[in-house]
Design a protein with these regions (language model features):
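Active-site phosphate-binding/coordination module
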Residues: 49-133
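Short glycine-/acidic-enriched loop or helix-start segments at secondary-structure transitions
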Residues: 21-22, 79-82, 103-104, 223-224, ...
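Glycine-rich, phosphate-binding/catalytic loops in enzymes
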Residues: 26-30, 86-88, 231
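Conserved acidic, metal-coordinating active-site core of Asp-based
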Residues: 129-213, 218-227
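Mg2+-dependent phosphoryl-transfer enzymes with acidic/Ser/Thr/Gly-rich catalytic loops
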Residues: 26, 190, 197-271
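A general structural motif
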Residues: 5-7, 65, 89, 149, ...
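Proline-centered loop/turn at the N-terminus of a beta-strand
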Residues: 9, 67-68, 91, 179, ...
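Active-site neighborhood of HAD-like aspartate-dependent phosphohydrolases
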Residues: 2-70, 80
Length: 271
């Protein structure tokens, strides 16, 4: 058992792990028993993401007790819309590990390191994007995006997406050094060296942290959870759907906003 007081880095995914859209809150209780909610993100003048007030209090407490690092696939602009409770995190990781933010400012040295690793091992983004676009069908393709000039994703109509399409794309992408995964309505194509875990390890090195606690719900979080000494995943999401686990990862039964609360309780107990 690791003694309390050991320098610890708490690295957590955000969307559908700590913060939730209205559709993802999964409020199954009677309306009169529903938790009070705190809006933590507004987009185009509309509330978009929430935490329960209980989770907000727990996060504020955690941020004062340990080095808390938000870790997200969001771009820097998308991350900038989020207003988490408690002290502002000194460090944040955006673009699936492509950007380190230090006091809100991106670290150009880290970006250069990431770019060099990708260039050495992967086909160019433009090539992968072109092949992805050519393989997609306008009947189910809703949007096509490139994030931070690092990776690409498609927003699709899941009901019309053909069975086996993602698997077929993943096979040719693998030979180009890219990984493809379906997460909700999005199909991500991400260069294999672009990982959340690499960025978290770099922050652990910089901060002198001897232990990492982590949480996440999606396939892009798997490497982050594997890099942690202890980790948790909620009862929803792609990892839960696949029954994914690892020795240091605890699969929680809670889903939606209740899972966000429970993850924060586990973090606090672990620091």
């Amino acid at each position: 058992m690791t003694p309390r007081g050991t320098p610890t880095l708490v690295a957590s995914d955000l969307d559908r792990t700590l913060i939730y859209s209205a559709a993802a809150l999964d409020l199954r209780m009677p309306d009169a028993d529903a938790p009070r909610l705190l809006c933590v993100e507004v987009y185009e003048s509309r509330p978009l993401s929430y935490m329960t007030e209980t989770a907000a209090g727990l996060l504020g407490e955690l941020s004062r007790a340990a080095a808390f690092v938000p870790v997200t696939t969001r771009t820097r602009e998308q991350y900038g819309r989020i207003r988490l409770p408690g002290p502002a995190p000194r460090y944040a990781i955006c673009a699936n590990g492509g950007h380190l933010l230090v006091d809100g400012v991106f670290d150009p040295d880290w970006r250069r390191q990431v770019a060099a690793r990708i260039a050495a091992a992967c086909a160019p983004l433009a090539e992968v994007r072109d092949r992805l676009s050519a393989a997609a069908d306008p009947a189910w393709l809703l949007k096509e995006r490139v994030a931070e000039d690092l990776f690409a994703y498609l927003v699709v109509d899941r009901a019309l997406l053909p069975d086996g399409w993602v698997k077929d794309v993943a096979e040719w992408a693998d030979g180009l050094g890219w990984a493809v995964s379906l997460q909700g309505r999005k199909i991500y194509a991400v260069p294999k060296p672009l990982t959340k875990s690499a960025a978290v390890r770099e922050l652990a090195r910089r901060t002198g942290a001897e232990r990492i606690l982590a949480a996440g719900d999606s396939l892009l979080d798997a490497d982050l959870l594997l890099a942690a000494h202890r980790a948790w995943r909620p009862g929803h999401g792609e990892l839960a759907d696949q029954g994914w686990t690892a020795p240091q990862v605890e699969a929680l039964t809670e889903t939606g906003a209740a899972a966000g609360e429970e993850i924060l309780r586990r973090f606090l107990a672990g620091v």
